[in-house]
C-alpha cells in the first residue's frame, strides 16, 4: 500500500491534567513553544502570546511550515493545542510530544489530520486519525 501524499499535517490536541502554573504563564508557554518548534524541526518566523485576566493564555508561533497555537484554561488544567505543518522537513508529532511533556499533561486526545489530499485537478480533501493517551499515572510525571 502506498503512502498518501498530503500538503500538510494538522494535529488538534485536547490536553488535560496540565500544570495550572505553566498554563497561566505566557512567558513560560512561549519558551516551551519556541523549543517545541526546534524539536519539531521547524523554522520560527514570529510569535505572540497574550495573558488574560485573571487567568489563561492564548498564543501562536508562526513557523515557515505554518503554526503552533494554544488556548489555556489553567483553572481546569486544560489546553487546546494546534500544530500544523506543510512540507516534508518538519516533525509535528515531536513538537506535540514535547509540549505535552512540558505542560505535564496527564491525558491527551489527539487528532491527526492529513490536509490537502488531492482527489483530482481542483479538489482536495483530508483524512483524520484520532487517538487518546493517558500520559502520566501520578503527579510526579512517572508512569
Curated annotation (Swiss-Prot):
Residues annotated as the enzyme's active site: 66, 71, 86
Entry GO CC: cytosol
InterPro entries reported for this sequence: AdoMetDC_C, AdoMetDC_fam_prok, AdoMetDC_N, S-AdoMet_deCO2ase_core, S-AdoMet_deCOase_pro-enz
SUPFAM superfamilies, A to Z: S-adenosylmethionine decarboxylase
Keyword list, A-Z: Autocatalytic cleavage, Decarboxylase, Lyase, Polyamine biosynthesis, Pyruvate, S-adenosyl-L-methionine, Schiff base, Spermidine biosynthesis, Zymogen
Catalytic activity reported: S-adenosyl-L-methionine + H(+) = S-adenosyl 3-(methylsulfanyl)propylamine + CO2
Segments forming a coiled coil: none
Cofactor note (record): Binds 1 pyruvoyl group covalently per subunit.
Post-translational modification: Is synthesized initially as an inactive proenzyme. Formation of the active enzyme involves a self-maturation process in which the active site pyruvoyl group is generated from an internal serine residue via an autocatalytic post-translational modification. Two non-identical subunits are generated from the proenzyme in this reaction, and the pyruvate is formed at the N-terminus of the alpha chain, which is derived from the carboxyl end of the proenzyme.
Subunit structure: Heterotetramer of two alpha and two beta chains arranged as a dimer of alpha/beta heterodimers.
Assigned protein family: Belongs to the prokaryotic AdoMetDC family. Type 1 subfamily.
Identification of the protein by name: S-adenosylmethionine decarboxylase proenzyme
Organism: Thermococcus gammatolerans (strain DSM 15229 / JCM 11827 / EJ3)
Gene field: speH
Amino acid at each position: 500500500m502506498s503512502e498518501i501524499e498530503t500538503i500538510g499535517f494538522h494535529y488538534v490536541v485536547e490536553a488535560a491534567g496540565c500544570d495550572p502554573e505553566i498554563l497561566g504563564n505566557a512567558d513560560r508557554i512561549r519558551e516551551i513553544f519556541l523549543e517545541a518548534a526546534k524539536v519539531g524541526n521547524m523554522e520560527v518566523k514570529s510569535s505572540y502570546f497574550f495573558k488574560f485576566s485573571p487567568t489563561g493564555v492564548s498564543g501562536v508561533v508562526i513557523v515557515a511550515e505554518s503554526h503552533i497555537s494554544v488556548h489555556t484554561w489553567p483553572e481546569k488544567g486544560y489546553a487546546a493545542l494546534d500544530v500544523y505543518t506543510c512540507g516534508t522537513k518538519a516533525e509535528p508529532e515531536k513538537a506535540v510530544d514535547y509540549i505535552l511533556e512540558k505542560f505535564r499533561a496527564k491525558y491527551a486526545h489527539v487528532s491527526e489530520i492529513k490536509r490537502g489530499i488531492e482527489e483530482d485537478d481542483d479538489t482536495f480533501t483530508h483524512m483524520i486519525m484520532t487517538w487518546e493517551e493517558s500520559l502520566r499515572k501520578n503527579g510526579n510525571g512517572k508512569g
